[in-house]
């Protein structure tokens, strides 16, 4: 027997129903923001991710990369932004003056240590908006990420936010920070000594060094923002207040990818035990399109991790409230010679927008009934010898236990007038 690969998981049955419900909810919400879905390949040339985040540990240590039959390096996508930018430039959308608002959803891959809420194949839903840079756009994008979680009933969340400033601020601060840490180099853990040379801002993320006094006393990037960047960031903070977003200024927030500029943020969930889990994050990337040899085109985006999101929702009313079953009707055919009449009826119901199923084995009535009820239909439609002879069908509501016999030609109108089914189709 084969088992699934470590760090992956199967989605099926009730879990799949809950996932689909959440996916549909998010799609409906994003449509109201006039976001268009974009689907990029799961595989890209390795250079796509090298170009976007050459010095990030995700690219250097966590990607699944292999060579194809022509010796080219292919990578399973570890994140969504790089593929969207590659597509944006390749399709010459950077040459237009339009604001492009995209969302994506799908699987991603990183080779990291599996643990609760973290997998090697995982799912993200993300938003990328390209073509403009504005503090007001920052506010709406952050608010959308916040609103998405709140609309799912996850209210105990906080937006942690910082600014990395413009390119000038970023470069100046890197030198200031490096000069400061030079005198504390021996106090850095081995990983942070490596980061010191390649991606120094990631030292702020280190769990080993983060509580050390020398890092708490380190220069903050906020204090080195040029005036325009500081004014811009203060406008973002004011906008979040206006939108009643629960946020916290976090000076050590830098995010894991090195293409971010200006506003960066994470959304953390505060559970009942007082622990925090990052549900998603994002920020601005004013220079990323030019790294892909596109025309200057600023952008902002975010991604939410579905596995962590679903682990919270699994215990919430969004997935657990008592909803009516998704199967409208099960047609119980008692004899093989009645099967095609039952199949025609099922086809008619499906054509009219109802979900319908029927049996393919013909057991005793009691056994067939037991099998049918396992499908949890709202209505059981029984086609036996008497019904077959008179072009009738016996309909039983599996919740109220009410039963009636009507002509087969009246089944559709009967179901269309049913309040329970109207509830299902409206929700």
From Swiss-Prot:
Keywords: Aminoacyl-tRNA synthetase, ATP-binding, Cytoplasm, Ligase, Nucleotide-binding, Protein biosynthesis
InterPro entries, per database record: aa-tRNA-synth_II, aa-tRNA-synth_II/BPL/LPL, Anticodon-bd, Anticodon-bd_dom_sf, His-tRNA-ligase, HisRS-like_core, HisRS/HisZ
Major location (coarse): cytoplasm
Regions annotated as coiled coil: none
Catalytic class of the enzyme: ligase
EC number: 6.1.1.21
UniProt subcellular location: Cytoplasm
Catalyses which reaction(s): tRNA(His) + L-histidine + ATP = L-histidyl-tRNA(His) + AMP + diphosphate + H(+)
GO cellular component assignments: cytoplasm
Listed GO MF terms: ATP binding; histidine-tRNA ligase activity
A biological process term (GO) from this entry: histidyl-tRNA aminoacylation
Protein family membership: Belongs to the class-II aminoacyl-tRNA synthetase family.
Oligomeric and partner information: Homodimer.
Designated name of the protein: Histidine--tRNA ligase
Species per Swiss-Prot/TrEMBL record: Aster yellows witches'-broom phytoplasma (strain AYWB)
